[in-house]
């Protein structure tokens, strides 16, 4: 039944009438996502893209029954937008915004504890259940309904894995970009746990990168999990020099932690199949499933 979102998910957009909110809402509607409205403070009572605009998330939820929100708000205001969605008890919140100050996200992280909200991102491409619901900036046409769950810190590498699994005929159950910032709402462990429990997901692709210990935590979880499914992983940044940030804010090797080799070793010890080239992700998964 996929995870997080499906054709019944009712989505609102925060930052609805802005340039990015408008463009990507149009794309989501064209894909078939059940967009029910949007939020732009001061523009409540108007319509945009033939959908109602509200001043607050609380009002939007009360009027539309929305249970998911996507946020296209500038970095300085994005954390407040997330907090507003948490306060309104929106179940799934996807924040696309890059560059949110770390201390702002620490406040958000604290607010998430004990809340009813699952935050995806920030600095992420979003979530898609192919053929049902697209929340985010990913190109919808490369996705195909299928059985592979994909979770990634990198947006463009997510698209690479999607295109390859589509090309070899496997397709995807749900694809999640968790984002490349050091403080995010949902991590690898959260997503892998959901995929392992999902009957529709037969195998998992996990795309990590240097920096932090999210991949090592995932390896330990996989090792301890009683539910087993085939998992293929690619880690970006094998040639990255220590101390140099590589694209994402969280992609930096500090001291003795966060290197690609450490992550690869941890994942291999958990039984994860490693591919060292992003061009081989789909083929590696297909070969693994054919062997099984």
Curated annotation (Swiss-Prot):
GO terms for biological process: tricarboxylic acid cycle. Pathway: Carbohydrate metabolism; tricarboxylic acid cycle; succinate from succinyl-CoA (ligase route): step 1/1. This is Succinate--CoA ligase [ADP-forming] subunit alpha. Its EC number is 6.2.1.5. Belongs to the succinate/malate CoA ligase alpha subunit family. It is an enzyme of class 6 (ligase). Substrate binds at residue 159. One of its GO terms (molecular function) is succinate-CoA ligase (GDP-forming) activity. Succinyl-CoA synthetase functions in the citric acid cycle (TCA), coupling the hydrolysis of succinyl-CoA to the synthesis of either ATP or GTP and thus represents the only step of substrate-level phosphorylation in the TCA. The alpha subunit of the enzyme binds the substrates coenzyme A and phosphate, while succinate binding and nucleotide specificity is provided by the beta subunit. It comes from Rickettsia conorii (strain ATCC VR-613 / Malish 7). The active site is at 248 (tele-phosphohistidine intermediate).
């Amino acid at each position: 039944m996929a995870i997080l979102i499906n054709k019944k998910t009712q989505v609102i957009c925060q930052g609805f009438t802005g340039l990015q909110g408008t463009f990507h809402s149009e794309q989501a509607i064209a894909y078939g996502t059940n967009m029910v409205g949007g939020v732009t403070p001061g523009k409540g009572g108007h319509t945009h893209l033939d959908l109602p605009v509200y001043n607050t998330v609380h009002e939007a939820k009360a009027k539309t029954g929305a249970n998911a929100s996507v946020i296209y708000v500038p970095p300085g205001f994005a954390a407040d937008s997330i907090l507003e969605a948490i306060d309104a008890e929106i179940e799934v919140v996807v924040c696309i915004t890059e560059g949110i100050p770390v201390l702002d996200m620490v406040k958000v992280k604290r607010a998430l504890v004990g809340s009813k909200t699952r935050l995806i991102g920030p600095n992420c491409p979003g979530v898609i259940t192919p053929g049902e619901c697209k929340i985010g900036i990913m190109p919808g046409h490369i996705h195909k309904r299928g059985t592979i769950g994909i979770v990634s810190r990198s947006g463009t590498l997510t698209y690479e894995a999607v295109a390859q699994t589509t090309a070899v005929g496997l397709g995807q159950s749900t694809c999640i970009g968790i984002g490349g910032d050091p403080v995010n709402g949902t991590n690898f462990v959260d997503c892998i746990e959901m995929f392992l429990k999902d009957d529709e997901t037969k195998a998992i692709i996990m795309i990590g990168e240097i920096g932090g210990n999210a991949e090592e935590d995932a390896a330990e979880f996989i090792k301890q999990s009683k539910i087993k499914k085939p998992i293929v992983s690619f880690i970006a940044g094998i040639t990255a020099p220590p101390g140099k940030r590589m694209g994402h804010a969280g992609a930096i090797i500090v001291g003795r932690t966060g290197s690609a080799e450490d992550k690869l070793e941890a994942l291999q010890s958990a039984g994860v199949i490693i591919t060292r080239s992003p061009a081989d992700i789909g083929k590696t998964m297909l070969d693994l499933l054919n062997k099984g």
